[in-house]
């Protein structure tokens, strides 16, 4: 299983609604009270990825959701380092 599929699997396990197309995962959380659309580009560095997410998250997003994204990013970094 490649890292993109692994990441999709993690999102599925924690019940985050997402769609994927051409190596880009789009997340639109149902539990956020605002209109938010994030694209996570798989394969860029940890810092680039984190910055990308921070640039796209608007104020008011559920704090638990942000923490969840950080956990997912950490999973991805760990996977990168061991593959």
Give residue spans per PLM region.
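Glycine-centered secondary-structure boundary/capping sites
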Residues: 13-15, 42-45, 74
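A short, charged, amphipathic alpha-helix used as a generic interaction element across diverse proteins
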Residues: 64-76
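Metal-dependent nuclease catalytic core centered on acidic motifs
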Residues: 75-83
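Short aromatic-glycine-(Arg/Gly/Cys) micro-motifs in beta-strand/loop hairpins
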Residues: 40-54
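Negatively charged, low-complexity tracts enriched in Asp/Glu with abundant Ser/Thr
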Residues: 1-31, 50-66, 82-83
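Short, charged/polar, Gly/Pro-enriched secondary-structure boundary elements
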Residues: 32-37
């Amino acid at each position: 299983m490649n890292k993109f599929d692994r990441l999709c699997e993690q999102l599925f396990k924690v019940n985050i609604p997402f769609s994927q197309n051409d190596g880009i995962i789009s997340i639109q959380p149902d539990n956020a009270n605002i209109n938010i659309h994030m694209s996570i580009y798989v394969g860029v560095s940890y810092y680039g990825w984190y910055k990308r997410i921070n640039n796209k998250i608007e104020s008011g997003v559920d704090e638990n959701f942000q923490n969840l994204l950080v956990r997912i990013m950490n999973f991805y970094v760990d996977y990168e380092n061991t593959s």
